């Protein structure tokens, strides 16, 4: 028993009108996580899910199909929602958790179906993998997402540098993230922050299609560091 709620559009429009051009209003797809595999990993232990995918793949696909149908039902209620961007995916589909082979079989087809439905309502989609993208770059492109995040560097748990990902995907998909939220943004010096922003702009953002941002949440970052980060980003111009 898992009823699917309908999205209320009025509060979203109110927030969108308040925010205007001062930020990006993100939306979501219903569930503990937006992606089907990722949602399943919240319903059962991820280790058990991985073992089941190898030993009982038909059962896992049946579960994912049930979740997909519910998510598509929710997406229908999103028509007209004033979101700038819809986040899908989730960390348990990253290549730091599962193999590219498992991602291809148990994530790609379901992600693609959701993204097609979202694009049918004229939404832009960003696919979240918590930085573990090595080996699944082509699948992220193939699933139809408009952007890939969080482009986490190895220093904060990713498995390739942001510019390595950029070289592989080129201009086929936008990238969001790239800044180590702890070692650079929280504990780094102003010069460290500025240098990293400029490096990312030159190596990742040189051809456009890049939003320079932290690779994950930052809870203890000094406000002054955020100001340095924002000021450095403003200096990056084409």
Whereabouts are the PLM-identified features?
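Active-site loop segments of alpha/beta catalytic cores
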Residues: 1-238
